[in-house]
Each structure stands twice: as C-alpha cells, then as structure tokens.
Amino acid sequence: MSRQKKSRNIVDVMPQRKSDKSQISPASYARPSKKLTRYELDAKAREDKKKKKHKGLTSGSRHSRSEQHNNQQMQEKRDPRLGSRKKVPLVVEFVNNPEKGQFIQPVQVQPAEEKVKKLDPMLELEQLENNECLNQLLDALDEGKTISAEDQKFVDECLDRIAQLMDELGIEDEEESEDDLLRTFEKIDINQFK
C-alpha cells in the first residue's frame, strides 16, 4: 500500500507577505472543521492587535505639543508692524529713465574746504615739511627733471602754504650767503676732525 503525500499549504510554512495581505483575509486561513494552525493563530492575533484601541500617546508627542504651544505664544507676542513681507530690491534696477519719470537724485557732497578742520599752524607746517610726495618732487626739480603740470601746481601750492605759515608763526627762512659760507669754511680747524 502506497502512501499518498499530503500537500502542505504555503500559508502553514511561510510568513505572509504584505502584498498578499490585501488579497487573503485571516478568515480564509481557517479550515472548516479542524483546529487553527500556529501560523493562522498568529495572523489572527496580529489582526486583532491592529483593531484594538491603542492606549497612550504617540512617541515624541511631548516635544511636538510644546513646539505648538511655544509657537502660539510667540505669535501672540509678535508686533504686527515688524517683519514686512514686502520685497526690498538689493540692486538699483534703473539709471535715470526720463521717459518713465524715474530719476536718481544726485548725492550732495560737501566741499573739501569745509571738511578740513583748521589745524594748528605749527602742526600743519610740520606735516607739509615731512610730506614725502612733496620732498620727492622737490628733489626731482633740483636734479633738473621735468614734472607734470599737476605736480608743478601741487608743489607751488605747498610752497605758498609753507610761506604763509612761516609768516604767521614769525619764522624767517635764513639763507646764508656764499660769503658767510666761505668765512665759516676758513675758520674751521681741520685738525679737529682727525
């Protein structure tokens, strides 16, 4: 007598996939007259557990609630005049369009004379005498080089200002004559420098 092999249900051996769940309901697992298998009992328990009313709050609920509460408080305290939604252009988009009536007002600059504070005449004289640019131009003139018209104008203005300041302070520019230089040279004792 040969035995016939019993065919097993796939449901008894393998777990149910998510794609199969929608097609097969747990009631279809049950055999009409026999006891439920272990797998069928597990599947039924899972379905029952899903249907039960969940107790407690969802995880992380205290953080989300406090954020909502804080947001409400911030909105109540916020001044409605602050934080305009109007967009502000960061770049000037036009340059004098007279056809459209758009003009950029020119910026009024104060003259340089008003900006310069009056310095003490002695300080101003020291600054002019120690001016490197002026000294370089004067050296170039002494060497016989030609300088540009702008540089010549600058030198003339500086020298005139130095003369004015020296007159104000009562300082006289003593230029020694050649005779005085010759006398001092003759009086010098050369042995003194040995």
Curated annotation (Swiss-Prot):
Alphabetized UniProt keyword annotations: GTPase activation, Ribosome biogenesis
GO molecular function term, any single one: GTPase activator activity
Single GO BP term: ribosome biogenesis
Biased composition annotated in UniProt, kind: Basic and acidic residues: 37-48
InterPro entries: YihI
Pfam families: YihI
Entry keyword Cell membrane: no
Region (Disordered): 1-87
The keyword Amino-acid biosynthesis belongs to this UniProt entry's keyword annotation: no
Similarity comment: family membership: Belongs to the YihI family.
The protein's role, per its UniProt record: A GTPase-activating protein (GAP) that modifies Der/EngA GTPase function. May play a role in ribosome biogenesis.
NCBIfam families named among the record's database cross-references: PRK05244.1-1
Quaternary structure annotation from Swiss-Prot or TrEMBL: Interacts with Der.
Protein name, as recorded: Der GTPase-activating protein YihI
Organism: Mannheimia succiniciproducens (strain KCTC 0769BP / MBEL55E)
